[in-house]
Amino acid sequence: EWGATKIAVAHNSNDRSETQLFHLFRGSGIRGLASILPVRDRIIRPLLCLERWEIEKFLQQRGIVYCKDATNEEDDYTRNRIRHHILPYAEENIVKGCVAHMNQTAELLAETEDYLELQTKEAAGRCIQATDGDGESAETGDSRNAVICIAVESFLSLHPVIRKRLLYEEVKQLSPGQKDITYQHIQ
């Protein structure tokens, strides 16, 4: 209706830190620890560089009314417990400015993830061929009868990090819609 190509959401650096800790506690890798990205598909997050208090102060100074999700105040959800207890404790007792430091780390990890993703795609081009089960070349996105052929010698010459990432991507391609493919699946 509006002809918009992007959707802007109000995630801020606190949200990013909460997500990063949540992913850390779940045992996520680099992708998860990079946390919330500033741009992902059609979603943009222009406030990711600001802390929640900075946004609220800006709005209050200008008399702008904003909405608060009441469920964010409850401790029923893991993210809220991180928000209400762990991050404030870390800020007060461990490192002042920890949210800013964690966001720096998230940015570095996002850059690292981009690089590793590129390396993984290049390695896939050298090591992986998808067939339709009859030996005919197939798109890896069509997993109904897909068979993944791995050039073993090329695969084994890869760094272990790239091998694991490559296996992860192939399992993901063969299991569309599957959530939570874990480190244990790849081992």
Language-model-detected regions and their locations in the chain:
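Alpha-helical structural signal
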Residues: 17-21, 83, 186
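Mid-to-C-terminal catalytic subdomains of enzymes
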Residues: 62-99, 104-107
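Active-site adenylate/phosphate-handling loop in enzymes that bind or generate adenylated species
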Residues: 1-54, 61-62, 89, 119-144
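AMP-forming adenylation/ATP pyrophosphatase catalytic core
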Residues: 38-40, 84, 103-187
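Residue-level signal for short amphipathic helical patches enriched in basic/charged
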Residues: 2, 16, 28, 50, ...
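Short glycine-/small-residue-rich flexible loop motifs, especially phosphate/cofactor-binding loops
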Residues: 55-58, 168
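A short glycine-threonine-serine/GTX helix/turn-capping micro-motif
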Residues: 45, 68-77, 151-158
